[in-house]
Regions:
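Signature of small four-pass
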Residues: 97, 103-120
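Long, low-complexity intrinsically disordered regions
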Residues: 1-95, 99-102, 122-221
Length: 221
């Protein structure tokens, strides 16, 4: 009986661990971590190549802040829904979180292309625009995720331990502050960056859309 009890305890512990940290969460966290590690390891651009304009560098760095904040929101929501006992509700969240994860992967790919381009000279308009457009898509996707959370929060409260709910709200507030700060930094560089983004083809209302989406006070947090 003691052996069976110990075995059951180990299985229960493994189940809880798997619920709190899902494989999908690990993949997203690892992808984000690898990107920032690659960024830290990037050497300075060779002196013989054209320098990337400083407004563009500041603009893209603010985009990295948005990526980091969104990845924190993703991890917090994944952990929160993983401990819910409402399987139907969890399935709904898993679908929208899966879309959010893909949008972050696309943003990371766009940032990787930008980082590689800066090593060879000033990136062309298409590379810079891809970062902006991918960022727009990610922010819009996560806005839908947060809106869904806002609608389903009362139901989640009955299926998730209150400790997880408190932690989730704290992380969301911190992430939203980071998002708004990054959006303000991007907006400050918008006029200077616009000629580089619009060199080939204007990206329709990209700057205004991003600022409106991230800075919208109606975002449910």
């Amino acid at each position: 009986a003691a052996t069976r009890s110990a075995s059951e305890s180990r299985e229960a512990g493994a189940a809880v661990t798997g619920a709190v940290a899902s494989p999908a969460e690990h993949i997203v966290d690892a992808e984000r971590t690898r990107y920032f590690r690659r960024l830290s390891a990037l050497p300075s651009a060779p002196p013989n190549v054209a320098a990337t304009p400083k407004p563009v560098l500041k603009f893209v760095d603010a985009t990295r802040g948005i990526l980091f904040a969104l990845s924190q929101i993703y991890s917090a929501l994944t952990q929160h829904t993983a401990v819910s006992t409402d399987e139907r509700l969890v399935a709904h969240f898993q679908r929208v979180l899966g879309i959010a994860a893909k949008s972050m992967s696309a943003l990371i790919s766009a940032l990787d292309r930008f980082d590689a381009a800066t090593q060879a000279g000033a990136p062309d308009a298409g590379v810079i625009r891809a970062v902006l457009d991918s960022c727009n898509v990610s922010v819009r996707t996560f806005r839908r995720v947060i809106s869904m959370l806002h609608m389903q929060l009362p139901q989640l409260e009955h299926s998730v331990n209150v400790r997880f709910s408190r932690t989730l709200l704290l992380l969301l507030c911190g992430s939203m502050a980071e998002l708004r700060n990054s959006a303000e930094l991007m907006a400050a560089q918008a006029d200077a960056v616009a000629p580089y983004v619009n060199e080939e083809r204007p990206s329709e209302h990209s700057f205004d859309t991003l600022a409106d989406t991230v800075g919208d006070e109606s975002l449910p947090v």
